[in-house]
Amino acid sequence: MKLSAPAGAFRQLAAHMPEIPRADLALALVTLWLGRLCGRMDYAAGFIFMRRMGSAALTATGPVLNVLPLAVNLHATEDLPTLAKRLAAQLKKMRRHQRYDAEQIVRDSGRAAGETPLFGPVLNIKVFDYHLDLPGIQAQTHTLATGPVNDLELALFPDENGGLDIELLANAQRYDDATLSRHALRLMALITQFADNPALRCGDAQMLLAEEQTQLAHLNNTAVTIPAATLSDLVAQQAQKTPEASALADAHYHFTYREMREQVVALAYALRERGVQPGDSVAVALPRSVFLTLALHGIVEAGAAWLPLDTGYPDDRLRMMLEDAQPKLLITTQAQLARFHDIPGMEYLCYSQPLPVSDATPLRLSLPHHTAYIIFTSGSTGRPKGVMVGQTAIVNRLLWMQDHYPLTADDVVAQKTPCSFDVSVWEFFWPFIAGAKLVMAEPEAHRDPLAMQRFFAQYGVTTTHFVPSMLAAFIASLTPASAGEKLRFLKARFL
């Protein structure tokens, strides 16, 4: 690929810096361009030396070129003349070593064949052109082949009229024509920027083309206005729209949106009677069932935050979480109660049956700035730590999901993720802001691929979540017949 600097731009730039030879200026521009392209302020380039020491060598025939590694160190606060002078000083020192074969450097450095090469792109400054000045003849030389190119090779031709031509050779296995063309446009734009502003610092030069800047602005234009709403607000609004639609089910219970709201409000009042105030936290140690979902919604309705306790965790882990978080109340079952009875000062609410409902006005005590839940880290880097996640963050996530992967009233979402895993949050709430249905897998069923096949088929699940390892096990358990029969409704899988 042959390039020419924008008309007059390189000449204008050289006029601003008369103390800098044009060859040095061109080298500084290209090394800066390469460094900014690859995101490296320090890299090794190859520089071609003639290796013709003395007048006799200058007229000898045959190829004697040598390529030596040039350490390029870019500084963001440096201007172009300073960079050009530094590189020129480096090359002056290197010239005395131009007879030191690159192959010998590899051997002397103890490098093995195939290891990281001495340099990446190769640079060459040619202070001549291809035109031959012969009496009465207009002639031009042509380079038929330069040999294989490992990465990039650039030959710089600063001409006597102040222009700059560049020959760019590239490894076709690494670069295509479209990529090289765009990189070339960036180099031309870089030259124009310095011509317009000679004092521009190297770190301030813009590498994006105008259309790329526009594209980036549009691609990153993701700002949205988040409504001042809470999780309970969104669910209540949907319940008003579709009160008799199917909302929540497990193997033993089924609730419409109206019935679910009645249970949530009843539980919120029960929590208030137990002393739970807005801003408090309530621990939940329930096996997977409709009551686990109702408990989380009831806690949010009361303005509190839930602390999920996976009943599959060891007792010591659960005790540590309770001691750290100091919840106001623990919602559990009679079967689980024995695990917590010796924790000093802990109040309990056993919850495994629907509550009596009334016409009580919904509390709606949660506010957007309230904490929605507390989740503990895995502890892989030390003691697990509790993290408080706010209502606004979850509302933002759920509205984004509904915008990108919209659920409808025809969707059935599987709740199979343990409640101690943050991914479970969208399972517990997303369906209820879209009029969809949430179905609860049996406790521990998420570990059994065959049980999940039966579960998906029984409820006609359309949307589910898998961690990659479990998805692999699930797929391995399928046969062509079972996939068609058990998964005929499934359309969305989140990893």
Ranges and model annotations:
Residues 385-414, 422-462, 477:
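Conserved AMP-binding/adenylation subdomain of ANL enzymes
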Residues 1-20, 110, 208-213, 241, ...:
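Flexible, P/S/T/G-rich "lid" or insertion loops adjacent to the active sites of thioester-utilizing
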Residues 287, 334-337, 417-420, 442-445, ...:
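Adenylate-forming
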Residues 15-27, 37-142, 172-176, 277-280, ...:
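His-Asp-centered acyl/peptidyl-transfer active-site segments
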Residues 37, 67-69, 78, 98, ...:
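Carrier-protein-dependent adenylate-forming modules in NRPS/ANL systems
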Residues 120, 319, 328, 411, ...:
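Conserved acidic residues
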Residues 1-8, 22-24, 41-47, 55, ...:
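Flexible, Gly/Pro-enriched loop and linker segments at secondary-structure and domain junctions
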Residues 286-287, 375-378, 411, 417-418, ...:
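Active-site beta-alpha turn of Rossmann-fold NAD(P)-dependent dehydrogenases/reductases
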